[in-house]
């Protein structure tokens, strides 16, 4: 039968940069068993939301309406675990929706999403416990942002190799489902992984979902697209089973 896919980690840059990386992961969503709810864990790039936030309003894209799982939202709100905001203008979420809808083309009418904008990690274990195994988790995060543009220049030599090595170490914590280790590693090195809090919540959800197998599907940097070696962002696609 169809494989159960517990989740993916995908980048959220413009499609021209990270689209081909994300496509590897969404291909697996298309092939896997259709989930009751797709939980999309996002970054709050504009620091507008406190704690962990979500919305009640459905989203509209070129493929039509993506319905928010309002029952699940209400459950999380009632338990004081998330708060509802009016409007999420957040590209780390918006970039994922057409990909997800396209992957679920046969089930568009039944597609339900639960976007969570993660700005705080104090209650991620409690939030994770609220989910059963009928969900698929989508973590929306790029990896290292390197260069003066990002105020992050820890390496002067062998830059690409050093960034790749560091990303590999970060991904090892993710694969080991060690959210504390991951956050400590990122904080200690002041590493510019924008979705670190979303990743930490994702890890806790994958622990609850009994993930046993994590695979790296794709990894590259924007410098391979733009040929700019002084400022670049690295992207990875991971799948969790």
Regions from the language model: what does each represent?
Residues 1-204, 208, 222-226:
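Active-site histidine-anchored catalytic micro-motif
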Residues 111, 211-241:
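Long, Lys/Arg- and hydrophobic-enriched amphipathic alpha-helices
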């Amino acid at each position: 039968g169809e494989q159960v896919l517990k989740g993916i980690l995908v980048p959220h840059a413009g499609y021209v940069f990270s689209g081909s990386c994300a496509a590897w992961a969404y291909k697996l969503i298309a092939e896997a068993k259709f989930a009751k709810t797709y939980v999309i864990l996002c970054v709050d790039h504009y620091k507008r939301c406190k704690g962990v936030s979500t919305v009640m309003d459905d989203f509209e894209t070129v493929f039509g309406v993506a319905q928010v799982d309002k029952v699940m939202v209400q459950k999380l709100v009632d338990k004081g675990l998330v708060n509802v905001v009016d409007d999420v203008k957040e590209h780390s979420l918006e970039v994922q929706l057409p990909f997800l809808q396209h992957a679920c083309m046969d089930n568009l009418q039944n597609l339900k999403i639960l976007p969570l904008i993660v700005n705080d990690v104090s209650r991620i274990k409690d939030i994770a416990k609220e989910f059963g195994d009928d969900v698929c988790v989508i973590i929306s995060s790029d990896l290292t942002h390197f260069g003066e543009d990002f105020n992050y220049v820890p390496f002067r030599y062998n830059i690409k190799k050093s960034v790749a090595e560091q990303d590999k170490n970060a991904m090892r914590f993710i694969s080991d489902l060690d959210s504390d280790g991951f956050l400590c590693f990122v904080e200690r090195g002041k590493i510019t992984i924008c979705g670190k809090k979303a990743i930490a919540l994702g890890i806790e959800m994958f622990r609850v979902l009994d993930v046993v197998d994590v695979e790296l599907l794709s990894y590259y940097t924007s410098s391979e697209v733009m040929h700019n070696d002084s400022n670049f962002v690295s992207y990875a696609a991971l799948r969790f089973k």
